[in-house]
Structure formats: C-alpha cells, structure tokens
Amino acid sequence: MSGIEQLAETVATDLEQRLPGQRKTQRDKLALLVATMLQVRSATLMDVAACLPRLAERLDSRYQWIKRFLANARVVSDAVMAPYGREVLARLSAQGQTVVLLIDQTKVSERHQVVMVAVRLGGRALPLAWRVKETQGAIGFAEQRAALEAAARLLPAGTKPVLMGDRFYGSPDLITWCSGQGWDWRLRLKQDLLVFEDGGATTLAACFRRGEHRLRDIELTEKRVRTNVAMVHEAGHPEPWIIALSQAPSVHTAFDYGLRWGIEAMFSDFKTRGFGLEDSQIRLAGRLDRLILIMALALFWAVSTGMWDAVHRPTPAEKNPAMADPGAMPDPSLPCSSGACGAFTPAFTA
C-alpha cells in the first residue's frame, strides 16, 4: 500500500467519524483526493490524476474520475467543512481566546473570484466557508453574507467573534450585519467615505487631515450606519489605516487590524506558494468550489501536522520563545496528536 493510500485510509476514517451521514463512496473519494493533493500540491487535474492510486485505470480515466467527483452537487462544501470548523472554533472559545474571523477575496481563475471566511489560528488562518462567483471584480454583499452565515452557524453558543476585513469589506451593509449578529468588527474603510457628525458632512480623509483620528459613534455614508473609527499612519506606509470598529477607538484597537494578514498567508497556500489553485483551468464555479474543498481539508491536515510537530519536536527557535515569533507559536494544549501515516493527524482531533 502506497503512502497516499495509507493517508487516504486515515482521512476516510476521520471523515466517517465527522460525517456519518455522508455516503461512504463520497467520503472515500474525497479522502483519496485529499491525500493525493497533499502529495502532489497541484491544482492541475492531470497532475493529480497522474498520482491518484487507481492503478487499474488509464491516466485519462483517472482524470475523468476526478472531474466526475468535482461535478457532484451532492458533495456540499459547507456540510463537509462544518465539523472541522466547529471543533476549531469550540476549542478556541473554550481556551478563552477571542475568536478572530477574517474575510477576504481572491482571484482563482481568469473568470472566477472566491470570497472566503477563515479563522485566525497560530499566526495564520484556516478556511471555514467560501463562495465562488464568476466575476472580474469584487464579489457582492449577498455572497459575503452567505459565507459569513455559514461560518456563523459553526460558532459555539455565546461566542462573540471579531471580524476583520480590508477595504472591500468596510461597507455599511457589513457593519450593519455584524452589529445585528452581536459581533465585534475591525474593517478598513476607504478614505472618501462620507461621515456625518454633529449635523455636518465631511469625509474620512478630511477628518484625518484635520487630526481627528478617533471618531466616536459617527454616522457613515448616506445609509447613516453608526460605528467608531480609529486612524493610524505608520512611518514609511503610503496611506493611513482608517478602521471602523465596534469598540472604543484607539491606536491599539486600530492596530488589531493587522491580524488579518493571516488570511493572506492562507491564500498563498492555496495559490502560488502552495497548491496553485489559479492554474486549475476549471471553468465552472461548482467544480472550483469542490476543488477548494479538497485543498481546504488538505490544509487542515497539513497545519495540524505542523502544529503537532512544533509542540512535540520543536526546533531551537520553537523551544526558546525569545527566538520565535510569538504570534506563530503553537499552544501545547491545541488539539494536535500523533496518528497513523507518520505525523499526519485528523485536524484538531481530541
């Protein structure tokens, strides 16, 4: 039995425990594709087919087998990801940590963009939910809301996360949605947005020029959405950060926005520095969605393996916190344990 087949068996066992209602054939195929993706690290289906351990079939038959799986509408990404996301969020909440959710968009093909909601963990991010859309520009609020609602369903009762997003997401609609959910937010704003305060109208850029860097309970845009705003401008940076936030505005709360960079590292894992998602040449949104699902599960396994290794076989830098990046250091209490197939483990099993 090859290493891919051994890992696929372990992934399939994990999927059976998490998704007992899913058809066994779907779980087994998904497990085999996740294991192969971890080996190949390529979104090119022919590369995946070349390593897929189905020796009785020709290469073109294996390629068609993958395409049929990606076309299977019964494989629903939200449903498959739910137990993984739910466990990570529950453990973060149980440890008393603030759950930091990140939202961002990236180009996944010449025709498609994906908006993704992720959770920050150990200085990086793990995907929770996403929506793929055929578009050349920004994905609208309807798809953002759908991905956020899918992620919200995974939160433990009583958990109040903070949502972070860049200037695509500093919108009145999203601020209103967060407020309605009882979430906190740190959302970067465009400088030309209108501000209404004390009966007058101005822009955020004008406020910044006047030295008004902390605005409390202002009304934003013609929709008159209420929020606080904090502005900071570090030396050497071309533009200030203008951050809408739910809590009292301060330099400290504005710099919280920097936590969102974890999702950029995650997108690199999906794309140029990892699986090469943008090279898939897939033309249909549903198939791209399920390819992202395969990569997302592979990423959960890879990250949990790395975190387990850092705890149990630390490098000198990991042994000495003064030498390491504190934001990237794993917590020994995180649910990473040794398992079959070398160090690969079901992501965040107890």
Residue ranges: model-predicted function:
Residues 46:
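Residues within the helices of the helix-turn-helix
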Residues 102-103:
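Short hydrophobic beta-strand that contains or immediately precedes a catalytic carboxylate
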